[in-house]
Protein backbone atom coordinates (compact mmCIF):
# COMPACT_ATOMS: atom_id res chain seq x y z
CA UNK A 1 0.00 0.00 0.00
CA UNK A 2 1.31 3.46 -0.92
CA UNK A 3 2.30 5.63 2.00
CA UNK A 4 -0.14 8.45 2.72
CA UNK A 5 1.11 12.03 2.57
CA UNK A 6 0.85 14.30 5.60
CA UNK A 7 -2.06 16.12 3.92
CA UNK A 8 -3.89 12.84 3.30
CA UNK A 9 -3.36 11.72 6.90
CA UNK A 10 -4.64 15.10 8.10
CA UNK A 11 -7.69 14.87 5.84
CA UNK A 12 -8.57 11.39 7.04
CA UNK A 13 -8.32 12.57 10.64
CA UNK A 14 -10.62 15.52 9.88
CA UNK A 15 -13.24 13.16 8.40
CA UNK A 16 -12.94 10.46 11.10
CA UNK A 17 -16.22 9.69 12.84
CA UNK A 18 -18.19 12.17 10.76
CA UNK A 19 -21.23 11.09 8.76
CA UNK A 20 -24.75 12.16 7.86
CA UNK A 21 -23.79 15.83 7.85
CA UNK A 22 -25.97 18.68 6.63
CA UNK A 23 -25.07 19.65 3.06
CA UNK A 24 -23.36 22.95 3.93
CA UNK A 25 -21.39 21.36 6.78
CA UNK A 26 -20.21 18.52 4.54
CA UNK A 27 -19.24 20.92 1.75
CA UNK A 28 -17.23 23.04 4.20
CA UNK A 29 -15.36 19.93 5.39
CA UNK A 30 -14.61 18.78 1.84
CA UNK A 31 -13.43 22.25 0.78
CA UNK A 32 -11.15 22.63 3.80
CA UNK A 33 -9.42 19.34 3.01
CA UNK A 34 -9.10 19.69 -0.77
CA UNK A 35 -5.35 20.25 -0.70
CA UNK A 36 -4.20 19.17 -4.17
CA UNK A 37 -2.23 21.61 -6.30
CA UNK A 38 -5.11 21.78 -8.79
CA UNK A 39 -8.72 22.89 -8.31
CA UNK A 40 -10.30 19.59 -7.28
CA UNK A 41 -13.74 18.56 -8.48
CA UNK A 42 -16.40 18.03 -5.82
CA UNK A 43 -18.01 14.70 -6.64
CA UNK A 44 -21.32 13.22 -5.54
CA UNK A 45 -22.21 9.54 -5.24
CA UNK A 46 -25.78 8.39 -4.71
CA UNK A 47 -26.48 4.79 -3.71
CA UNK A 48 -29.91 3.89 -5.05
CA UNK A 49 -32.23 0.98 -4.35
CA UNK A 50 -32.35 -0.14 -7.98
CA UNK A 51 -30.90 -2.88 -10.16
CA UNK A 52 -30.07 -1.24 -13.51
CA UNK A 53 -29.84 -4.66 -15.17
CA UNK A 54 -33.65 -4.52 -15.27
CA UNK A 55 -35.01 -2.06 -17.84
CA UNK A 56 -37.73 -0.80 -15.48
CA UNK A 57 -35.11 0.07 -12.84
CA UNK A 58 -32.68 2.04 -15.02
CA UNK A 59 -31.97 5.55 -13.76
CA UNK A 60 -30.87 8.01 -16.42
CA UNK A 61 -31.29 11.72 -16.86
CA UNK A 62 -29.82 15.16 -17.24
CA UNK A 63 -29.72 18.26 -15.05
CA UNK A 64 -28.41 21.79 -15.52
CA UNK A 65 -26.56 22.76 -12.35
CA UNK A 66 -27.52 26.31 -11.31
CA UNK A 67 -23.89 27.32 -10.80
CA UNK A 68 -22.27 25.25 -13.53
CA UNK A 69 -19.61 22.58 -13.13
CA UNK A 70 -16.51 24.73 -13.41
CA UNK A 71 -15.27 22.33 -16.06
CA UNK A 72 -14.35 23.20 -19.64
CA UNK A 73 -16.52 20.66 -21.48
CA UNK A 74 -15.29 19.52 -24.89
CA UNK A 75 -18.13 18.61 -27.25
CA UNK A 76 -18.14 16.34 -30.30
CA UNK A 77 -21.03 16.48 -32.77
CA UNK A 78 -22.01 14.03 -35.50
CA UNK A 79 -23.66 16.13 -38.21
CA UNK A 80 -23.46 17.09 -41.87
CA UNK A 81 -24.07 20.24 -43.90
CA UNK A 82 -25.87 23.15 -42.23
CA UNK A 83 -26.15 21.26 -38.93
CA UNK A 84 -22.38 20.74 -38.87
CA UNK A 85 -21.95 24.48 -39.42
CA UNK A 86 -24.46 25.16 -36.63
CA UNK A 87 -22.49 22.93 -34.25
CA UNK A 88 -19.22 24.71 -35.02
CA UNK A 89 -20.82 28.12 -34.58
CA UNK A 90 -22.22 27.03 -31.20
CA UNK A 91 -18.72 26.14 -29.99
CA UNK A 92 -18.37 22.39 -30.58
CA UNK A 93 -14.68 21.44 -30.67
CA UNK A 94 -15.08 18.39 -32.92
CA UNK A 95 -17.61 18.05 -35.75
CA UNK A 96 -17.76 15.31 -38.35
CA UNK A 97 -19.36 12.15 -39.74
CA UNK A 98 -17.44 9.14 -41.09
CA UNK A 99 -14.16 10.88 -40.30
CA UNK A 100 -15.19 11.35 -36.66
CA UNK A 101 -16.31 7.72 -36.47
CA UNK A 102 -12.90 6.56 -37.70
CA UNK A 103 -11.13 8.81 -35.19
CA UNK A 104 -13.13 7.29 -32.34
CA UNK A 105 -12.56 3.75 -33.62
CA UNK A 106 -8.82 4.42 -33.56
CA UNK A 107 -9.10 5.05 -29.82
CA UNK A 108 -8.82 8.83 -29.94
CA UNK A 109 -11.58 10.19 -27.72
CA UNK A 110 -10.89 13.82 -26.89
CA UNK A 111 -14.34 14.99 -25.81
CA UNK A 112 -16.61 14.92 -22.77
CA UNK A 113 -20.01 15.00 -24.51
CA UNK A 114 -21.19 13.52 -27.80
CA UNK A 115 -24.19 14.88 -29.70
CA UNK A 116 -25.74 13.63 -32.95
CA UNK A 117 -28.51 14.59 -35.34
CA UNK A 118 -31.07 11.76 -35.75
CA UNK A 119 -29.97 10.95 -39.31
CA UNK A 120 -26.46 10.20 -38.03
CA UNK A 121 -27.52 7.49 -35.57
CA UNK A 122 -27.04 4.53 -37.97
CA UNK A 123 -23.40 5.63 -38.16
CA UNK A 124 -23.06 6.42 -34.46
CA UNK A 125 -24.69 3.09 -33.58
CA UNK A 126 -21.55 1.31 -34.75
CA UNK A 127 -19.68 2.97 -31.90
CA UNK A 128 -21.93 1.64 -29.13
CA UNK A 129 -19.28 -0.65 -27.63
CA UNK A 130 -16.83 2.25 -27.43
CA UNK A 131 -19.07 5.14 -26.40
CA UNK A 132 -21.59 3.20 -24.28
CA UNK A 133 -19.26 2.16 -21.43
CA UNK A 134 -17.96 5.75 -21.25
CA UNK A 135 -21.51 7.15 -20.98
CA UNK A 136 -20.86 9.11 -24.19
CA UNK A 137 -23.42 7.46 -26.47
CA UNK A 138 -25.90 10.04 -27.83
CA UNK A 139 -29.38 9.38 -26.46
CA UNK A 140 -32.67 11.17 -27.23
CA UNK A 141 -33.75 10.72 -23.58
CA UNK A 142 -31.06 13.15 -22.44
CA UNK A 143 -31.26 15.49 -25.41
CA UNK A 144 -28.07 14.45 -27.18
CA UNK A 145 -29.86 13.09 -30.27
CA UNK A 146 -31.50 16.20 -31.64
CA UNK A 147 -31.92 18.51 -34.60
CA UNK A 148 -31.45 21.49 -32.27
CA UNK A 149 -27.69 21.13 -32.29
CA UNK A 150 -27.07 24.71 -31.15
CA UNK A 151 -29.12 24.29 -27.97
CA UNK A 152 -27.53 20.92 -27.18
CA UNK A 153 -23.99 22.25 -27.53
CA UNK A 154 -24.77 25.34 -25.46
CA UNK A 155 -26.39 23.20 -22.74
CA UNK A 156 -23.37 20.88 -22.58
CA UNK A 157 -21.09 23.86 -22.14
CA UNK A 158 -23.41 25.66 -19.74
CA UNK A 159 -23.40 23.32 -16.75
CA UNK A 160 -25.58 20.45 -17.96
CA UNK A 161 -24.68 17.11 -16.35
CA UNK A 162 -25.80 13.68 -17.54
CA UNK A 163 -26.19 10.83 -15.06
CA UNK A 164 -26.74 7.10 -15.34
CA UNK A 165 -26.91 4.37 -12.70
CA UNK A 166 -24.01 1.91 -12.76
CA UNK A 167 -24.36 -1.83 -12.17
CA UNK A 168 -24.38 -1.50 -8.39
CA UNK A 169 -27.10 1.16 -8.53
CA UNK A 170 -24.69 4.04 -7.91
CA UNK A 171 -24.89 7.40 -9.68
CA UNK A 172 -21.71 9.52 -9.83
CA UNK A 173 -21.18 13.08 -11.04
CA UNK A 174 -19.06 16.16 -10.58
CA UNK A 175 -21.08 19.01 -9.06
CA UNK A 176 -18.56 21.84 -9.08
CA UNK A 177 -15.06 22.77 -8.04
CA UNK A 178 -13.55 23.03 -4.56
CA UNK A 179 -12.98 26.74 -5.25
CA UNK A 180 -16.75 27.33 -5.47
CA UNK A 181 -18.45 29.06 -2.56
CA UNK A 182 -20.16 26.75 -0.06
CA UNK A 183 -23.62 28.05 -1.00
CA UNK A 184 -23.06 27.48 -4.72
CA UNK A 185 -21.88 23.91 -4.21
CA UNK A 186 -24.84 23.25 -1.90
CA UNK A 187 -27.25 24.56 -4.55
CA UNK A 188 -25.67 22.31 -7.18
CA UNK A 189 -25.84 19.27 -4.90
CA UNK A 190 -29.52 19.81 -4.13
CA UNK A 191 -30.31 20.34 -7.82
CA UNK A 192 -28.56 17.09 -8.71
CA UNK A 193 -30.30 15.10 -5.97
CA UNK A 194 -33.66 16.53 -7.04
CA UNK A 195 -33.03 15.48 -10.65
CA UNK A 196 -32.13 11.93 -9.61
CA UNK A 197 -35.27 11.79 -7.47
CA UNK A 198 -37.38 12.90 -10.42
CA UNK A 199 -35.77 10.18 -12.53
CA UNK A 200 -37.03 7.45 -10.18
CA UNK A 201 -38.00 4.49 -12.39
CA UNK A 202 -41.34 2.71 -12.23
CA UNK A 203 -39.70 -0.55 -11.15
CA UNK A 204 -37.95 0.88 -8.08
CA UNK A 205 -39.16 -0.80 -4.89
CA UNK A 206 -38.56 0.11 -1.27
CA UNK A 207 -36.09 2.85 -0.35
CA UNK A 208 -34.97 4.66 -3.50
CA UNK A 209 -32.18 6.92 -2.18
CA UNK A 210 -30.16 4.90 0.32
CA UNK A 211 -27.09 7.09 0.76
CA UNK A 212 -25.60 10.30 -0.62
CA UNK A 213 -21.90 11.10 -0.22
CA UNK A 214 -19.58 13.82 -1.46
CA UNK A 215 -15.81 14.04 -1.78
CA UNK A 216 -13.14 15.99 -3.59
CA UNK A 217 -11.06 14.40 -6.35
CA UNK A 218 -8.22 13.42 -4.02
CA UNK A 219 -9.99 13.52 -0.66
CA UNK A 220 -12.05 11.20 1.56
CA UNK A 221 -15.82 11.07 1.32
CA UNK A 222 -18.51 11.98 3.81
CA UNK A 223 -22.19 11.00 3.82
CA UNK A 224 -24.95 13.59 3.84
CA UNK A 225 -28.08 13.82 5.94
CA UNK A 226 -30.77 12.88 3.42
CA UNK A 227 -33.22 15.37 4.86
CA UNK A 228 -30.85 18.25 4.20
CA UNK A 229 -30.54 17.22 0.55
CA UNK A 230 -34.30 16.89 0.11
CA UNK A 231 -33.53 13.29 -0.89
CA UNK A 232 -35.56 11.56 1.80
CA UNK A 233 -38.54 9.72 0.34
UniProtKB/Swiss-Prot annotation:
It comes from the Bacteria. The keyword tRNA-binding applies. Part of the 50S ribosomal subunit. It comes from Paracoccus denitrificans (strain Pd 1222). One of its GO terms (biological process) is regulation of translation. The gene is rplA. GO terms for molecular function: rRNA binding; structural constituent of ribosome; tRNA binding. It holds the Pfam family Ribosomal_L1. Binds directly to 23S rRNA. The L1 stalk is quite mobile in the ribosome, and is involved in E site tRNA release. Gene3D superfamilies: 3.30.190.20, 3.40.50.790. Keywords: Repressor, Ribonucleoprotein, Ribosomal protein, RNA-binding, rRNA-binding, Translation regulation, tRNA-binding. Belongs to the universal ribosomal protein uL1 family. GO terms for cellular component: cytosolic large ribosomal subunit. PROSITE patterns: RIBOSOMAL_L1. This is Large ribosomal subunit protein uL1.
Amino acid sequence: MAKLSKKQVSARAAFAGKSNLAVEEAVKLVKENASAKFDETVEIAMNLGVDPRHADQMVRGVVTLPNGTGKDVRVAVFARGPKADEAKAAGAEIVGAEDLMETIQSGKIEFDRCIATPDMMPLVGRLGKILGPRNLMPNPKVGTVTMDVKAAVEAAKGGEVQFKAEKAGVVHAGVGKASFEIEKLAENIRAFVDAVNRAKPSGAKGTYVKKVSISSTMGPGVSLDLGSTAAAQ
